[in-house]
From Swiss-Prot:
The gene is SDHD. The keyword Hydrolase does not apply. It is a multi-pass membrane protein. This is Succinate dehydrogenase [ubiquinone] cytochrome b small subunit, mitochondrial. It comes from the Eukaryota. SUPFAM superfamilies: Fumarate reductase respiratory complex transmembrane subunits (SSF81343). Residues 57-63, 112-120 are mitochondrial matrix. Residues 1-56 form a transit peptide. Membrane-anchoring subunit of succinate dehydrogenase (SDH) that is involved in complex II of the mitochondrial electron transport chain and is responsible for transferring electrons from succinate to ubiquinone (coenzyme Q). SDH also oxidizes malate to the non-canonical enol form of oxaloacetate, enol-oxaloacetate. Enol-oxaloacetate, which is a potent inhibitor of the succinate dehydrogenase activity, is further isomerized into keto-oxaloacetate. Pathway: Carbohydrate metabolism; tricarboxylic acid cycle.
Amino acid sequence: MAVLWRLSAVCGAQGGRALLLRTPVVRPAHISAFLQDRPIPEWCGVQHIHLSPGHHSGSKAASLHWTSERVVSVLLLGLLPAAYLNPCSAMDYSLAATLTLHGHWGLGQVVTDYVHGDASQKAAKAGLLALSALTFAGLCYFNYHDVGICKAVAMLWKL
């Protein structure tokens, strides 16, 4: 209540109420009957939010990509204890695939957010793809020709 009083002192008698209760996002249904449709003073700093039209929103592929990123993250949460409890070659290759994919998608978001310009972004994404492919190939080589990821981590813990 003190916040509403403070806003009304700053924005005028109806400003605080208009700021907090006239927007459909915040206004409860039982309060809307008591509010009158008065124009909101522009000097109070109230702005209307315009949502982007449906045809400008992301594609279905972006939604599936986001969902698959979450699935891989949850899969890693289950794979790590399972690999500790049951170290075998299937776990080693599963970890190699999911860790590489998780790292590739995470670093891809870093490239998207922080690398600017078309040419440099394409070069960074190509370098990331090469790094991810080499990482996966190296982990698979390590799993096939050496002790594997699970046993290597266990050996590191014994040190």
